Amino acid sequence: MSSGQSGVCPCQGSAGRPTILYALLSPSPRTRPVAPASHSHCLCQQQRPVRLCAPHRTCREALDVLAKTVAFLRNLPSFCHLPHEDQRRLLECCWGPLFLLGLAQDAVTFEVAEAPVPSILKKILLEEASSGTQGAQPSDRPQPSLAAVQWLQRCLESFWSLELGPKEYAYLKGTILFNPDVPGLRASCHIAHLQQEAHWALCEVLEPWYPASQGRLARILLMASTLKNIPGTLLVDLFFRPIMGDVDITELLEDMLLLR
């Protein structure tokens, strides 16, 4: 049997299925989102690094969303009156889902293209240069994968299909922000009460459409839970690192909220 079949990816077997060795060496599906087959023809393509097609425009829109997120928190007395340490812990845990809700609310769209992969020689030269310079930062940090970005885009599309209003977005942000399960909180009981209040407010907004609102509420909460599975590193690498470089978003938000 010939191994040089045209149009067959090296990660595929003769029947078009992933080879056993490739499957063993690939990352666990628990840590990597899997896109439907319609988006890609093979596992190799799903793992390819990608970058924004219009980084300056998209990063500017992402920064606008981040600023609106800060404004939302500043105008929320129930958050501002919490102990500063609790504010920091909630921010560290919840900034990603809040930012994603902001992207969905502002209908931010973006396209990605395959990122060039540096040659082995270039990697060796970069490693030698960085090892010879004290305090040098690694410049070959992996780009986001196509699978991860497509997963993120599908989450945003799902929220757009819900057509949430401003009040629904606001109360949903409250249910995500006030998470009493964040470790180390001093006022966890009070935060649990705030989360319940936000949940009740969301239910009241949907009440005029009862009983259909029950199914809508379930869909909203289900979609919100998926946002927590999108890693913050993906958001930083995709939306902020192309323009701002390596940045700690949590520290940036703390500075903007005057928590440090």
Swiss-Prot record:
Gene3D superfamilies: Retinoid X Receptor. Transmembrane segments: none annotated. GO terms for molecular function: nuclear retinoid X receptor binding; nuclear thyroid hormone receptor binding; peroxisome proliferator activated receptor binding; protein domain specific binding; protein homodimerization activity; protein-containing complex binding; transcription corepressor activity; transcription regulator inhibitor activity. GO terms for biological process: animal organ regeneration; bile acid and bile salt transport; circadian regulation of gene expression; circadian rhythm; negative regulation of DNA-binding transcription factor activity; negative regulation of DNA-templated transcription; negative regulation of gene expression; negative regulation of transcription by RNA polymerase II. Expressed in islets of Langerhans (at protein level). Expressed in a circadian manner in the liver. Transcriptional regulator that acts as a negative regulator of receptor-dependent signaling pathways. Specifically inhibits transactivation of the nuclear receptor with which it interacts. Inhibits transcriptional activity of NEUROD1 on E-box-containing promoter by interfering with the coactivation function of the p300/CBP-mediated transcription complex for NEUROD1. Essential component of the liver circadian clock which via its interaction with NR1D1 and RORG regulates NPAS2-mediated hepatic lipid metabolism. Regulates the circadian expression of cytochrome P450 (CYP) enzymes. Residues 16-260 form the NR LBD domain. Keywords: Biological rhythms, Cytoplasm, Methylation, Nucleus, Receptor, Repressor, Transcription, Transcription regulation. Disruption phenotype: Mice exhibit a significant disruption in the circadian rhythm of several important hepatic genes involved in the metabolism of lipid, cholesterol, fatty acid and bile acid. Its main location: cytoplasm. One of its GO terms (cellular component) is chromatin. It is found in: Cytoplasm; Nucleus. SUPFAM superfamilies: Nuclear receptor ligand-binding domain. The modification Symmetric dimethylarginine is found at R57. Heterodimer; efficient DNA binding requires dimerization with another bHLH protein. Interacts (via N-terminus) with NEUROD1 (via N-terminus and C-terminus). Interacts with ID2. Interacts with NR5A2, PPARA and PPARG. Interacts with RARA, RXRA, THRB, NR5A1 and NR1I3. Interacts with EID1. Interacts with NR1D1. Interacts with RORG. Interacts with NFIL3 and BHLHE41. Interacts with HNF4A; the resulting heterodimer is transcriptionally inactive. The keyword Membrane does not apply. Arginine methylation by PRMT5 enhances repression activity of metabolic genes in liver in response to bile acid signaling, by increasing interaction with cofactors. This is Nuclear receptor subfamily 0 group B member 2. InterPro entries: NHR-like_dom_sf (IPR035500), NR0B1/2 (IPR033544), Nucl_hrmn_rcpt_lig-bd (IPR000536), Nuclear_hrmn_rcpt (IPR001723). It holds the Pfam family Hormone_recep. The keyword Transcription regulation applies. Belongs to the nuclear hormone receptor family. NR0 subfamily. SMART domains: HOLI (SM00430). It comes from Mus musculus (Mouse).
